[in-house]
Amino acid sequence: MSSPISAVSQMLERNQALFVGKRLLVCGTLEDDYPRQLAELASSLTVFTTDYCYYRSQQATLGDAILFDHQLGGAPRFDALLLLMPKAKAEAQYLLAMMTPLLEAGADLFLAGENRGGINGADKLLAPYGNKPVKRDSARRCSLYHGELSKPVIPFELDAWFSRYECKAGDTELTVLALPGVFSADELDPGSQMLLAAVPPMTGELLDFGCGAGVIGSVLAKRNPGLEVKMVDISALALESSRRTLAINGLQGQVQASDVYSDITGKFDHIVSNPPFHAGLKTFYAATETFLAKAPEYLSANGGLTIVANAFLRYQPILETHFKRTDIISSDAKFKVYLSKV
């Protein structure tokens, strides 16, 4: 039995004829099994995702047709692009700049997404690549736009897409590099700032869970010479950002994709995180609950988990259930920093 598909995919189902016989490239916010239907319609299908969780869910079915990375290159080989609108406009611009050099002249440009998610800015997004797109459909509070690649495209330069800023956490100064859509892409967020001010000195091995642009792990690596740092995230854009942040600061660390603990082996002396949280998205909360509940399995004897969270989130009961001791080591009206020991 197939899983339910999103409202955007239900709208696309009404427009299947647009994709028949195409050499189709799909990217953006993918969240269901709909690409399996596209595989039956298109003459060839390539699905590019920066989301490791989604990649794992589809890889067994789509096989070589699905790719997980921060970048896709090569010669022009597609005659249609379907971009499912990301939450961040800058990420949509990044994907279009990356994918259009892979399209043949005259290729179809399809943009689909929820009306509340920025899809109605399709005109401006597609302006560098062709004439004003046509709105093909509007259903279930979603819209589908259709344009054509009629303007010359410039080669994609990955380095041009990194934002750069200097941040200071206590006495530790850091240069941060981040791709569009990555958490802490433009500045050090207040939660991470509080976490880094509260965390004690560290030795041994550290896991930075949900590393984003690599700020937390990099600050702790710089502050604690000899600390072995591993950073994990589900976002390929975050992982590449973390690699760049480590490198530009002359720091060492391992960076890898993991869906919670899917690809983690061994035990750590410290796990530190500003866990992903987005109001109203139960999937993020469930992933964080799993992360907290299973953390003791990945901590060495006397190991500790340090997290920062919005003050209204009820993480303390979860921590107290799975750890011998949990203390709030810093707090204000917005955030709490918890230190839990096995």
Swiss-Prot record:
Molecular function in Gene Ontology: 16S rRNA (guanine(1207)-N(2))-methyltransferase activity; nucleic acid binding
Catalyzed chemical reaction(s): guanosine(1207) in 16S rRNA + S-adenosyl-L-methionine = N(2)-methylguanosine(1207) in 16S rRNA + S-adenosyl-L-homocysteine + H(+)
UniProt keywords, alphabetically: Cytoplasm, Methyltransferase, rRNA processing, S-adenosyl-L-methionine, Transferase
Group of enzyme by EC: transferase
CDD domains: AdoMet_MTases (cd02440)
Location in the cell: Cytoplasm
EC number: 2.1.1.172
Major localization listed first in the record, in broad terms: cytoplasm
Domain of life: Bacteria
GO CC list: cytoplasm
Subunit structure, interactors included: Monomer.
PANTHER family: RIBOSOMAL RNA SMALL SUBUNIT METHYLTRANSFERASE C
Summary of the function given for this chain in its UniProt record: Specifically methylates the guanine in position 1207 of 16S rRNA in the 30S particle.
Family the entry assigns: Belongs to the methyltransferase superfamily. RsmC family.
Protein name, UniProt field: Ribosomal RNA small subunit methyltransferase C
Native source organism of the sequence: Aeromonas salmonicida (strain A449)
Classification of source organism: Bacteria, Pseudomonadati, Pseudomonadota, Gammaproteobacteria, Aeromonadales
Gene from which this protein is expressed: rsmC
